[in-house]
UniProtKB/Swiss-Prot annotation:
It holds the Pfam family MFS_1. HAMAP family: MFS_YhhS. It is found in: Cell inner membrane. PANTHER family: MAJOR FACILITATOR SUPERFAMILY MFS_1 (PTHR23517:SF13), RESISTANCE PROTEIN MDTM, PUTATIVE-RELATED-RELATED (PTHR23517). Coiled coil: none annotated. PROSITE patterns: MFS. The keyword Kinase does not apply. It comes from the Bacteria. This is Uncharacterized MFS-type transporter YhhS.
């Protein structure tokens, strides 16, 4: 974690502009994720002739690489400083585009081309974990730890914005220049971001002795568990809302997903100071309550408008969960370990989203689509109970007070 700067009285637009000037590098990393997202599955399946399994695996490789590399990204950010980690991550995003370009050149040899695509996806996953973790810590170093919740919130906003822009833009690039055109666009985005990042002033890495990974995990895992449970609600909306609408015989699933995204981003924009004013655990519990109501409305919906209101409330509720719990988790460790803490905490969400799809699919096959939303509401209720217990525990029993041994 960077050493905290002197925290001037930054407010409103000036504060947001300083944060956005850093988190735009995370925007660039997620844009390189969004650009090929709607193209590669069809390219692998239709143009290259591989099965749907291989098409899905090519996409999933990036997520696995992100999951496995994220703890290392946090630790290196603590030791080397976040700017170097961001630049390293953006270079990885550039190399992923180079992998796509080489795969296109090797298209006459399908297995070699597939391996190059897979290598590009793995490098992209590593690059994103470094760029994303580093940009959050860089932003905190620039505006001060008082505003860590706002920095995390803005990172989420640019993530959604980049993914929303990237997918249709990637389709246009592919229609214009094939896989080569898409690869060059990815490389151009990453290269531009690197060139913009290099002149920016660094924030110093903290020179304190880092805690071992087990000690960091021991201090943040309860907050991570609450995040993982709450993330199930997001997972079932994002993955299965289309099947839910089909099972009901309704139209409008795409609009429901748009409502979720608007509610998610809008809530973060409307309540930028909520975490500082009420405290992370209090905000998290309020959010859990709203998310539970939303999921119950979806699961019991008899009319399309009920489902849409439920999706809207779920997006509002889930919006501030990550920054609210993240603020508390990061402060549970010394400053020199806050990068590792943030990365370790984020892994819980990565894992939750990874297992929610398959498990919810099994439940859906056994009990029907609506049941998965009721089950997700139950998991969020468990997150609410866990957070309430954390709030009620005496300071000596909280994870941040736990021994590092």
């Amino acid at each position: 974690m960077p050493e905290p700067v002197a925290e001037p009285a930054l407010n409103g637009l000036r504060l947001n502009l300083r944060i956005v000037s850093i988190v735009m590098f995370n925007f660039a990393s997620y844009l390189t994720i969004g650009l090929p997202l709607a193209v590669l599955p069809g390219y692998v399946h239709d143009a290259m002739g591989f099965s749907a399994f291989w098409a899905g695996l090519i996409i999933s490789l990036q997520y696995f690489a992100t999951l496995l590399s994220r703890p290392h990204a946090g630790r290196y950010a603590d030791v080397l400083g976040p700017k170097k980690i961001v630049v390293f991550g953006l270079c990885g995003c550039f190399l992923s585009g180079l992998g796509y370009l080489l795969a296109d050149i090797a298209s006459a040899w399908p297995m070699i081309s597939l391996l190059l695509l897979g290598l590009g996806r793995v490098i992209l996953g590593i690059g994103q974990s470094f760029a994303g973790t580093g940009s959050t810590l860089w932003g905190v170093g620039v505006v001060g730890s008082l505003h860590i919740g706002r920095v995390i919130s803005w990172n989420g906003i640019v993530t959604y914005g980049a993914m929303a822009m990237g997918a249709p833009l990637g389709v246009l690039c592919y229609a214009w220049g094939g896989l080569q055109g898409l690869a060059l666009t990815v490389m151009g985005v990453a290269l531009l971001a690197v060139l913009l990042a290099l002149p920016r002033p660094s924030v110093k890495a903290n020179k304190g002795k880092p805690l071992p990974f087990r000690a960091v995990l021991g201090r943040v895992w309860l907050y991570g568990m609450a995040l993982a449970l709450a993330s199930a609600g997001f997972g079932v909306i994002a993955t299965f809302i289309t099947l839910f609408y089909d099972a009901k015989g309704w139209d409008g699933a795409a609009f429901a997903l748009t409502l979720f995204s608007v509610a998610f981003v809008g809530t973060r924009l409307l309540f930028p100071n909520g975490i500082n004013r009420l405290g992370g655990l209090n905000v998290a519990m309020i959010c859990f309550g709203v998310e539970i109501i939303g999921l119950l409305l979806v699961g019991t919906a008899a009319m399309p408008w009920m489902a849409k209101i439920g999706v809207l409330l779920t997006g509002m509720g889930f919006s501030l969960v990550f920054p609210a719990l993240g603020v508390v988790a990061v402060k549970a460790v010394p400053p020199q370990n806050q990068g590792a803490a943030l990365a370790t905490y984020t892994v819980f969400m990565d894992m939750s989203l990874g297992v929610t799809g398959p498990l919810a699919g099994l439940v859906m096959t056994w009990a029907g689509v609506p049941v998965i939303y009721l089950a997700a509401a139950g998991l969020v209720a468990m997150a609410l109970l866990l957070t309430w217990r954390l709030k009620k525990r005496p300071p000596s029993a909280l994870p941040e007070a736990a021994s590092s041994s």
